[in-house]
């Protein structure tokens, strides 16, 4: 099982997170807007962290030290 962090929970990020989670990956989603996590739906079984995806503390809370893959799918390069 791979550990994946998805930064950004918009249309693309939420679809990616759900697909990876459905396929058995351990997924954590980071987004600066807590309301964005509603895009994941009720069946998402991963975790979420509210914050900015380039903040070290946020990344540590998301499990970056055990992460196999990090996908940045935000609207902006610096989100």
Cite the ranges covered by each PLM segment.
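Cytosolic regulatory regions of ion transport systems
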Residues: 1-79
């Amino acid at each position: 099982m791979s550990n994946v962090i998805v930064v950004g929970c918009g249309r693309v990020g939420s679809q990616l997170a759900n697909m990876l989670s459905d396929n058995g990956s351990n997924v954590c989603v980071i987004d600066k807007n807590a309301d964005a996590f509603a895009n994941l739906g009720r069946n998402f079984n991963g975790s979420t962290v509210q914050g900015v995806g380039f903040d070290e503390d946020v990344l540590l809370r998301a499990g970056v030290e055990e992460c196999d893959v990090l996908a940045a799918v935000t609207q902006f390069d610096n989100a």
